[in-house]
Amino acid sequence: MSTAHNRANIEDVAKVVLMPGDPLRAKLIAESLLKDAVLFNDVRGMLGYTGTYKGKRVSVMGSGMGMASMGIYSYELFKFYDVDAIIRVGSTGSYSERLPMKSVALVKGSYSESTYA
């Protein structure tokens, strides 16, 4: 079933989706880490692939920039494609010197003081 932002059929998308912001980073991850990766989406330039990693079926798809774009793609993946988990991968900034460049952060949650929608 296609949506306005995703051309995939439900069986094209794995239960676990890695989501970098940059669609070209999704392509790089698919080409370098996934075995037998197949493109399932290219609508609006947002690339999505499914393949296997160490025998586990995994998808990777760009989210675009910002919360609005992430909100659209994550909503559709959960609501229409029966995804169980989305794992955000990629870069970010830090306000703390305790978290130096090239650190790895495993985040359990986040919040915003924004009043945006």
Model region roles, listed by residue range:
Residues 1-72:
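N-terminal short beta-loop-beta anion/metal-coordinating cradle
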Residues 42-117:
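Glycine-rich phosphate- or other oxyanion-binding loops that anchor nucleotides, phosphorylated ligands
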